[in-house]
From Swiss-Prot:
Known function: NDH shuttles electrons from NAD(P)H:plastoquinone, via FMN and iron-sulfur (Fe-S) centers, to quinones in the photosynthetic chain and possibly in a chloroplast respiratory chain. The immediate electron acceptor for the enzyme in this species is believed to be plastoquinone. Couples the redox reaction to proton translocation, and thus conserves the redox energy in a proton gradient.
GO cellular component: chloroplast thylakoid membrane
Lineage of producing organism: Eukaryota, Viridiplantae, Streptophyta, Embryophyta, Tracheophyta
HAMAP family, per database record: NDH1_NuoA (MF_01394)
Organism annotation: Cucumis sativus
UniProt name for this protein: NAD(P)H-quinone oxidoreductase subunit 3, chloroplastic
Pfam families: Oxidored_q4
Length: 120
């Protein structure tokens, strides 16, 4: 038998965290001034008129750096709880964590060999 009343606090949190942003958007839409003057629609660049097109294309190497950063950031999120409870978990979890780290090291070496970490 499932005891759904144990999840009441979760549903309250979910409803409140959904209602607050919706209310914020509605209130800002009602209270914001509606002026569509040319000054409001123009680009603003450090107090002077912009030169050229405002859209700039980024090179793919920046995305590769961001992707490698995200991978190792996620690794930190997974390894921190493991490190905090290392003495309780035992040898099998230690071996699993080593396999996880080895897979990430293989991915880093692959990205390094492919030149994804080269800045020039």
């Amino acid at each position: 038998m499932f005891l759904l009343y144990e999840y009441d606090i979760f549903w309250v949190f979910l409803i409140i965290s959904s209602v607050i942003p919706i209310l914020a958007f509605l209130i800002s839409g009602v209270l914001a001034p509606l002026s569509k003057e040319p000054e409001k629609l123009s680009s603003y660049e450090s107090g002077i008129e912009p030169m050229g097109d405002a859209w700039v294309q980024f090179r793919i190497r920046y995305y590769m750096f961001a992707l490698v950063f995200v991978v190792f950031d996620v690794e930190t999120v997974f390894l921190y709880p493991w490190a905090m409870s290392f003495d309780v978990l035992g040898v099998s979890v230690f071996i699993e964590a080593l396999i996880f780290v080895l897979i990430l090291i293989v991915g880093l070496v692959y990205a390094w060999r492919k030149g994804a970490l080269e800045w020039s």
